[in-house]
């Protein structure tokens, strides 16, 4: 997965690190206006948004080449949009978490952020 244009300075949910397990609905990052430019937030992006991509990598040498395989995530995002989880904001920390926890096989799922 590829996420771009995240929030400046604190793009990811607090305490989230590579390799953590997350559950559907967990907040993992925050939309922003960052991007490819020499100076942060001066790339012509005026609205905060998320650039989401999914790349298949079978061989690390294929990354950043003309042989990249990118998946059209339009159908995936449609399903996600129809099944959003409500979140709440902690005004003190400015972090968001999933409002409702859920059960999987009678085990309470809290994920990395909730």
Regions found by a protein language model. Name each.
Residues 12-13, 37-39, 61-63:
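Extracytoplasmic/secreted cell-surface and envelope-processing proteins
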Residues 5-8, 35, 54-56:
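A mature extracytoplasmic/lumenal domain signature
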Residues 1-25:
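Short histidine-centered loop motifs in beta-beta connectors
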Residues 42-114:
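Acidic, glycine-rich catalytic/binding loops that coordinate metals and/or anionic ligands
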Residues 1-5, 29-30, 51-53:
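Structural recognition of the beta-strand scaffold that forms the well-ordered cores
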Residues 9-11, 19, 40, 46, ...:
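Generic alpha-helical propensity signal that fires on short helical segments
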């Amino acid at each position: 997965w590829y996420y771009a244009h995240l929030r400046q300075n604190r793009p990811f949910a607090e305490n989230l690190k590579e390799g953590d397990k997350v559950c559907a609905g967990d907040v993992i990052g925050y939309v922003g206006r960052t991007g490819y430019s020499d100076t942060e937030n001066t790339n012509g992006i005026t609205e905060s948004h998320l650039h989401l991509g999914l790349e298949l990598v079978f061989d690390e040498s294929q990354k950043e080449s003309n042989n990249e395989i990118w998946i059209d995530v339009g159908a995936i995002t449609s399903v996600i949009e129809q099944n959003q989880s409500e979140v709440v904001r902690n005004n003190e920390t400015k972090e968001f978490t999933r409002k409702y926890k859920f059960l999987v096989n009678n085990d309470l799922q809290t994920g990395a952020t909730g």
